[in-house]
Regions:
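Active-site-adjacent substrate-binding region
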Residues: 36, 40, 44-95
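A short small-residue
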Residues: 1-8, 37-40, 97-104
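Generic non-transmembrane alpha-helical segments
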Residues: 21-33, 57-65, 82, 119-127
């Protein structure tokens, strides 16, 4: 049996703690069942903080445009992790029906896509004009 786990968090120490707990429990279960176990770390990436100025800017644009928003941490390995190493980075999420994303069942209402695009456009204009 092969199992892979993607442990996500905005805190590196939380990811490490969960990884240790999973390994310990897997070894306990394997021992109890008389099985062998091999644990391999395929990849480990440290969380990258997003730019507070860009986050503040997008929040302020939402407020002034009457766009409902929610500040959400993301523990996923998005392109923003790589970009944040060389430039200020932030992410804009739009809601998907029933919270399903990265899946064939994902559906986002076109009006929400339009609002997300409007927010992105206004953010880019202000950043381009250095108004943040």
């Amino acid at each position: 049996v092969e199992l892979s786990i993607d442990i996500r968090s905005t805190l590196a120490q939380s990811k490490a703690r969960v990884a240790r707990m999973v390994k310990e429990q897997a070894r306990v279960i394997a021992r109890r069942r008389g099985l062998g176990i091999e644990v391999l770390k395929i990849r480990e990436e440290n969380p990258v903080p997003l730019d507070p100025g860009l986050l503040r800017l997008t929040k302020n644009i939402c407020k002034s445009a009457g766009i409902d928003y929610e500040i959400m941490p993301s523990g996923a390995g998005h392109d923003a992790m790589q970009m944040a190493k060389i430039t200020p980075a932030a992410m804009i999420f739009v809601p998907s029906r029933r919270g399903i994303s990265h899946n064939p069942l994902e559906w986002t209402d076109p009006d929400d896509i339009a609002l997300g695009a409007q927010l992105l456009m206004e953010t880019l204009i202000r950043v381009g004009n250095e108004k943040f």
